[in-house]
């Protein structure tokens, strides 16, 4: 936890909902970091089909998920607005367009009128009315979904890249960075370099650079369990 100071600021007032598998490094690191900072952690019922009930009961300030679930949230909100149709549906999409334009122009999607009239209700229905930080990892997320969540939920959306061997994030986006198509800067606890792979045509001198991503630092694991037995196994 002491090496993960690059993670977003988390205070003892924060509330995190833990529902992703703890066998995966992403949730394990986030949960332990929250406890390390004195934040509260609530656990879901064990049924992902009831996650909405859990969110409404806990009202977390931090929400950590993967693109698949974020896509479902996006589809649920947009689908609900389309199903309403009429004036309510038109007003929703007008408000959404206005907030997206403001996000791209200023870096903030806040709009007092539309937030009060429309999006505050959406957030309460999802149990995310207190959510200030949304973290995403494990796979790329579409830029339009990310921007939608920024304006609909009104939270910082922070994406990262890493793996089990790097204790989750090896790179992480700055909380105030609203640009897309990247996974941020190297985490403070590690160094990254691109290693040329000539047989695959990867070169760090190319434009744009490419290569095998190599990571070193205190967040990198020491080795695999029973290394002497498994050293001849294929590595990812």
PLM regions: where:
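Conserved AMP-binding
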Residues: 19-24, 138-140
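Conserved AMP-binding/adenylation subdomain of ANL enzymes
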Residues: 1-15, 22-116, 152
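Short, well-ordered beta-strand segments
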Residues: 15-17, 214
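Conserved AMP-binding/adenylate-forming
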Residues: 114-236
